[in-house]
Amino acid sequence: MFNKNNNNNKIIIILKLFLIILIVNNNNNIKTFGLNLPDGYGAGLVDPTATCSNYIGDSIDQPLCNEKLPNYKNIYTSKNITIQYINQKIVEKTFISLTFLQSKCFDLNFAEFGICDIYFPPCFQTPTTITPIKSVSLPQRLCKSACERMVSNCSSLGASLNCSDPLKFPRIATLYNLTDYGFTANGGFFPVPCSDPLATFENKSTTSELIEICPSPLLLFNSSDPKYSADRGYTYLTPTNCVLPCVAPIYTEKKWHQMYNMSKILSTISFVCSIYNVLTFGILNHRRSKYNYCITFFSASVIIITMMDIVTYGIGYEKLLCPEPGRFAVQSDVSCGATGALFHIGITNGVFWWTTMSICLFAVVKRIKLFDFRYFIIFNTTASLISVIIPLAGNAFMAGTGSLACWIRKTWYVNSVFWIPCGIALTIGSVCIILVIYEIYKITKNVSTKDNRMILLQIKPFLCVTLVGGSFYYLFIFNFDNESHSKEYKEKVVDYVMCLLSDTGKECLMAGPNYVAYFVFYFFIRLFGITFFCIYGTSQNARDIWIHSKILNHPNIKPFLLKYNIINFNSMTHYGSGTNPTSNSKNSKNNQNNQNNNSRKEFESKNIELEVNESISKGQTTRGADDEEESNINSASNTSSD
């Protein structure tokens, strides 16, 4: 995730922070007063308020220098104890910087020993035999040899550690002027040996490992522990053990909740609309046609898709997608595996049924007799089931770093069982639609401008396949555009880390897809049910189905509808699946049969099929066989169901 080869130059910028935190702040404006220092010696000022005290200790949840100090009971502390708290914060920020230098540096554990030595230096308390007037506390500076080892193992540190400066990194000792405290030997300058953490490092390195600290909101886990492996849903910023938070910081929290709310609202509406379409065209409608089957099966696919969303927001988006801090849901999380499988089988089946509808439209226009329609049902269902079984077997369903649902996140699987087969299906459907448009164009050239009924009949099917097909194509375009920029997004993770290290207080976001494009991607997926309802669920065809349904003609319901004039049953069309309110006499039944025969033809003219329903006057085109649509599906009787 963290591209070390392309981002090494950027990582060096982290050391700008290092420049600040590695200045030895307890050596304020050291001056030598014209003293000619011996080779290997530095000089320092005496702080009369400084003391030798215990190290304040690390916090329970964040280890720092407890195991990296030679003697935690003897730490040089200037002014008051609060300076230790300040230095502790600086050390913590320094360790954060070192965490992200692991790809460039070696022996960083020793560097951490050196950092602790700089900010919590060993303390030398002068005895009265040396300073009879007053005992003073003096710090032991880090030895030049230790500084050079830190720099040699991590060249990036050379920009911030000037090991040649004897005032900060003496080779032998630091001289302090103790004349005012009664020391007279050596011209009043007392040498305090430098501190070399090598001995401490060699003694404690086996028990004190490199301390990694991740800036908030990144979390620290042990990647070598199978419990926290990447396969369990942890996204590591290699080579560190820092993982991305869940939900991924691609967008602001406000924008994530906007997408959650959009998904809740549209999915619920789409679910209800699809239930209505299945009930209308699949259950109440006794007159079957291949287009009614297409509507029914496509709407059933949308129901499955939206069920995924309903289950997800029922559990809670963040609870389902992020079952633990820093961990994205994977297939072994039952709710993720189940919702992911629902979504995949729904979206795949939906693509296949959209393609089937396109093929049927083309077959009607070209008067091509298709094979038994049951083969479409068998193929679409079987292919959809196989496409979900394969990724389930490969544990390929997971939430991913930024999404609203669990789905297939392994590239090989998603390309093999979705993008490639569905891409082929969309291509076939698109070719059919283009050919249909061409056929309509040829027909309309011979149609009188005064008689445009045939053209109007084609608006709904074309509007449907265009909107739904366009939505599917947008999903493809967005996905492959996102994939083409995935490397760029990964490379820019270092910018996100730099923002976290800068500690400016502003909200840091990772690079990712454009928010509007991402929003529209999920918007279209949840719009299918509403689109089909608006085109077919509100049609005269759907109203006729309900008027003739047993539900509205039920003895307990029909009187209520008549009483309040909700539905005008006198104007309804009687066709095979309807209920006839006329008398039961033999003549009435014969009249009813004749009426139903005529009504069936009228109903066909309202049907959703793309066909020329009437002859055009004066040498115009003639209509193809009306009964082709029923050749593969059991047709309804011409008589009343009652």
From Swiss-Prot:
<feature type="topological domain" description="Cytoplasmic">
    <location>
        <begin position="286"/>
        <end position="294"/>
    </location>
</feature>
<keyword id="KW-0325">Glycoprotein</keyword>
<feature type="glycosylation site" description="N-linked (GlcNAc...) asparagine">
    <location>
        <position position="482"/>
    </location>
</feature>
<feature type="transmembrane region" description="Helical; Name=7">
    <location>
        <begin position="515"/>
        <end position="535"/>
    </location>
</feature>
<feature type="topological domain" description="Cytoplasmic">
    <location>
        <begin position="536"/>
        <end position="642"/>
    </location>
</feature>
<dbReference type="InterPro" id="IPR000539">
    <property type="entry name" value="Frizzled/Smoothened_7TM"/>
</dbReference>
<feature type="coiled-coil region">
    <location>
        <begin position="584"/>
        <end position="611"/>
    </location>
</feature>
<feature type="compositionally biased region" description="Polar residues">
    <location>
        <begin position="614"/>
        <end position="623"/>
    </location>
</feature>
<feature type="transmembrane region" description="Helical; Name=4">
    <location>
        <begin position="376"/>
        <end position="398"/>
    </location>
</feature>
<feature type="disulfide bond">
    <location>
        <begin position="52"/>
        <end position="123"/>
    </location>
</feature>
<feature type="topological domain" description="Cytoplasmic">
    <location>
        <begin position="438"/>
        <end position="460"/>
    </location>
</feature>
<feature type="region of interest" description="Disordered">
    <location>
        <begin position="578"/>
        <end position="642"/>
    </location>
</feature>
<feature type="glycosylation site" description="N-linked (GlcNAc...) asparagine">
    <location>
        <position position="153"/>
    </location>
</feature>
<feature type="topological domain" description="Extracellular">
    <location>
        <begin position="482"/>
        <end position="514"/>
    </location>
</feature>
<feature type="glycosylation site" description="N-linked (GlcNAc...) asparagine">
    <location>
        <position position="177"/>
    </location>
</feature>
<feature type="domain" description="FZ">
    <location>
        <begin position="47"/>
        <end position="197"/>
    </location>
</feature>
<keyword id="KW-0175">Coiled coil</keyword>
<keyword id="KW-0732">Signal</keyword>
<feature type="topological domain" description="Extracellular">
    <location>
        <begin position="399"/>
        <end position="416"/>
    </location>
</feature>
<dbReference type="GO" id="GO:0004888">
    <property type="term" value="F:transmembrane signaling receptor activity"/>
</dbReference>
<feature type="transmembrane region" description="Helical; Name=6">
    <location>
        <begin position="461"/>
        <end position="481"/>
    </location>
</feature>
<keyword id="KW-0675">Receptor</keyword>
<feature type="topological domain" description="Cytoplasmic">
    <location>
        <begin position="366"/>
        <end position="375"/>
    </location>
</feature>
<feature type="transmembrane region" description="Helical; Name=2">
    <location>
        <begin position="295"/>
        <end position="315"/>
    </location>
</feature>
<keyword id="KW-0812">Transmembrane</keyword>
<feature type="transmembrane region" description="Helical; Name=3">
    <location>
        <begin position="345"/>
        <end position="365"/>
    </location>
</feature>
<feature type="disulfide bond">
    <location>
        <begin position="143"/>
        <end position="194"/>
    </location>
</feature>
<keyword id="KW-0472">Membrane</keyword>
<feature type="glycosylation site" description="N-linked (GlcNAc...) asparagine">
    <location>
        <position position="261"/>
    </location>
</feature>
<feature type="compositionally biased region" description="Basic and acidic residues">
    <location>
        <begin position="599"/>
        <end position="609"/>
    </location>
</feature>
<feature type="transmembrane region" description="Helical; Name=5">
    <location>
        <begin position="417"/>
        <end position="437"/>
    </location>
</feature>
<feature type="signal peptide">
    <location>
        <begin position="1"/>
        <end position="26"/>
    </location>
</feature>
<dbReference type="InterPro" id="IPR017981">
    <property type="entry name" value="GPCR_2-like_7TM"/>
</dbReference>
<dbReference type="GO" id="GO:0016020">
    <property type="term" value="C:membrane"/>
</dbReference>
<feature type="topological domain" description="Extracellular">
    <location>
        <begin position="27"/>
        <end position="264"/>
    </location>
</feature>
<feature type="glycosylation site" description="N-linked (GlcNAc...) asparagine">
    <location>
        <position position="80"/>
    </location>
</feature>
<feature type="glycosylation site" description="N-linked (GlcNAc...) asparagine">
    <location>
        <position position="222"/>
    </location>
</feature>
<protein>
    <recommendedName>
        <fullName>Frizzled and smoothened-like protein B</fullName>
    </recommendedName>
</protein>
<feature type="disulfide bond">
    <location>
        <begin position="65"/>
        <end position="116"/>
    </location>
</feature>
<feature type="compositionally biased region" description="Low complexity">
    <location>
        <begin position="583"/>
        <end position="598"/>
    </location>
</feature>
<keyword id="KW-1015">Disulfide bond</keyword>
<dbReference type="Pfam" id="PF01534">
    <property type="entry name" value="Frizzled"/>
</dbReference>
